[in-house]
């Protein structure tokens, strides 16, 4: 059975690859109720660093347990860690602008944490620096790898993604997903519409006002790499693809988005519609946690978390190398059993 669903085509996953996790924060995640990517709004600023640490070390150093939702559902970093362990992948962390820096080796592209997009997220100089340094990084990675899998960790990232998509003219209102089974659409809409009210007219001005550092860095790495890239994420990665398309239309043909079935099945969002507008194919891993012995993992089947830290893309890679959803679940449960 094929455990990878393809929508609008695909890219080849053959060859030597590296997994890149791009982390950042913005002050949007401090808005109460906008994200569940952390037990409290304040803890959301620790989530990207902790996700990065867990991906590399299988333990968190910046906080004393893995990032969880307010109801205790574990970070999708466990899916990425398990999948990439099965295929023995090279994993690199890029800090695009995280308020809390991870206590592991990472690549810094000279970014800053984003502010509240209702005021402004980044200065033009910071956006330009993130973009230029990320392009250089992509160019260097192209010397060693045939393709990249790029994941993200940024709380409230779907809100900044929606703001970017709308500011670039896409029909994306209410189409981005949420880590919660109850997508806080009214709150997101309110924040985003306030953010895009007085937009600068130029591209750099727009993304500096409403983007998060992660999206700009992912775009830069992909542009510099100039070869095949699997953007490992949900609706946020359609915004990264939209930024790429604005800068260099030709690069789009090298890109596919790799996500989870939980994003595709999410009735509160519409990744298929946005990806068609941008012109990128989507692939989804058909993982199944319904028979897991752990309630924290079974919750994924009920619409909690869904995606993040490259969970979809990394599991697509493991599935493409011949592992089954059951193999991946066994590895995830091994890791999860040490956490509880």
Curated annotation (Swiss-Prot):
Listed GO MF terms: nicotinate-nucleotide-dimethylbenzimidazole phosphoribosyltransferase activity
Superkingdom of origin organism: Archaea
CDD domains: DMB-PRT_CobT
PANTHER family linked to this entry: PTHR38811, UPF0284 PROTEIN SLL1500
Similarity remark: Belongs to the UPF0284 family.
Protein name: UPF0284 protein Saci_0020
Natural source organism: Sulfolobus acidocaldarius (strain ATCC 33909 / DSM 639 / JCM 8929 / NBRC 15157 / NCIMB 11770)
């Amino acid at each position: 059975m094929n455990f990878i669903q393809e929508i609008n085509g695909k890219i080849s996953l053959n060859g030597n690859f590296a997994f890149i996790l791009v982390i950042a924060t913005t002050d949007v995640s401090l808005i109460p109720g906008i994200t569940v990517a952390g037990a409290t709004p304040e803890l959301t600023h620790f989530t990207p660093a902790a996700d990065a640490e867990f991906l590399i070390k299988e333990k968190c150093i910046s906080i004393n347990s893995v990032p969880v939702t307010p109801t205790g559902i574990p970070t999708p970093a466990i899916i990425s860690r398990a999948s990439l362990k099965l295929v023995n992948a090279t994993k690199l962390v890029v800090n695009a602008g995280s308020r809390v820096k991870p206590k592991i080796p990472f690549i810094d592209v000279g970014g800053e944490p984003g502010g509240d997009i209702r005021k402004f997220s980044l200065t033009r100089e910071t956006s330009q620096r993130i973009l230029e340094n990320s392009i250089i990084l992509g160019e260097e990675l192209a010397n060693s790898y045939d393709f990249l899998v790029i994941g993200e960790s940024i709380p409230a990232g779907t809100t900044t993604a929606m703001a970017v998509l709308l500011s670039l003219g896409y029909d994306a209102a209410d189409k981005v997903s949420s880590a919660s089974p109850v997508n806080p659409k009214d709150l997101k809409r309110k924040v985003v519409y306030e953010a895009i009210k007085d937009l600068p007219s130029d591209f750099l001005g727009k993304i500096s006002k409403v983007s998060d550092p992660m999206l700009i860095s992912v775009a830069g790495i992909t542009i510099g790499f100039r070869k095949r890239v699997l953007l490992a994420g949900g609706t946020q990665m359609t915004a990264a693809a939209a930024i790429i398309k604005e800068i260099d239309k030709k690069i789009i043909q090298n890109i596919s988005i790799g996500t989870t079935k939980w994003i595709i099945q999410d009735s509160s969002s519409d990744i298929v519609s946005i990806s068609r507008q941008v012109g990128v194919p989507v692939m989804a891993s058909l993982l199944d946690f319904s028979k897991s012995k752990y309630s924290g993992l079974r919750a994924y089947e009920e619409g909690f978390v869904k995606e993040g830290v490259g969970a979809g893309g990394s599991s697509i890679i493991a599935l493409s190398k011949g592992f089954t959803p059951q193999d991946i679940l066994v590895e995830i449960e091994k890791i999860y059993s040490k956490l509880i």
